[in-house]
């Protein structure tokens, strides 16, 4: 999924036969830029990218640690860690709408000290690594560099929630059509979802856009090098909106 700052949004689904590190490395071969993911280690072999972590995943782990507390308990390290994450998201909401350069500066001024304080506080704690709280601390320590790399550029986001949301339609659809019988079927589903979700991400009406493609695509002059340009979502006619 493209970053929120990109004018031309792309939601790209890709079927792979497994979750091994070779698949994202192959898929993203040649790409250079920022890559925001969860903490899955399979992305570690992707070359030429700057990894960004997801603060929503970390906050969720502290949320789980708070839920594991005895009934009525509202103090302790789990609550404090949760509060740090909540404060960070509150500041982010206040910075929404700022130009990237201003958001970059405000983050350094307001969020960098909070992050330094959070890390120092976490480093001073000793918790059982297999407990819910321990899992949150392990995630924080292992993912700290990706988690804080969003400070590098004001266009970047602190979570990959947008990508997570783009996955939801496919997950819901899969429950209805009960998976794919063959790899070719899975690949076809990935193509359809890529087209539809990219259309939605660019404020198009998916039905009207698909109708436009089905009616006009067969008549395209494929001898032209730029034959596909008129069909891209950002070049679609107004009646697709």
Regions found by a protein language model. Name each.
Residues 1-241:
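Catalytic center-proximal scaffold of phosphoryl-transfer enzymes
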């Amino acid at each position: 999924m493209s970053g929120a700052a990109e004018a031309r949004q792309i939601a790209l689904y890709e079927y792979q036969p497994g979750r091994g590190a070779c698949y994202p490395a192959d898929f993203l071969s040649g790409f250079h830029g920022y890559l925001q993911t969860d903490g899955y280690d399979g992305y570690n072999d992707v070359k030429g990218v700057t990894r960004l972590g997801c603060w929503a995943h970390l906050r969720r782990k502290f949320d789980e640690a708070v839920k594991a507390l005895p009934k009525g308990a509202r103090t302790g390290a789990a609550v404090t860690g949760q509060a740090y994450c909540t404060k960070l998201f509150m500041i982010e909401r206040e910075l929404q709408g700022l130009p990237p350069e201003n958001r970059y500066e405000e983050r350094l001024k307001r969020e960098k000290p909070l992050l330094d304080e959070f890390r120092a506080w976490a480093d001073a704690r000793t918790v059982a690594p297999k407990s819910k709280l321990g899992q949150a601390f392990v995630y924080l320590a292992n993912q700290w560099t990706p988690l804080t790399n969003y400070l590098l550029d004001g266009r970047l986001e602190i979570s990959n929630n947008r990508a997570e949301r783009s996955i939801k339609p496919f997950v819901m659809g899969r429950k209805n059509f009960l998976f794919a019988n063959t790899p070719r079927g899975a690949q076809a589903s990935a193509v359809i979802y890529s087209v539809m979700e990219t259309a939605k991400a660019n404020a198009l009406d998916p039905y009207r856009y698909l109708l436009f493609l089905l009616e006009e695509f067969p008549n395209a002059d494929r001898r032209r090098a730029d034959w596909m340009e008129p069909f891209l979502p950002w070049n679609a006619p107004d009646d697709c909106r």
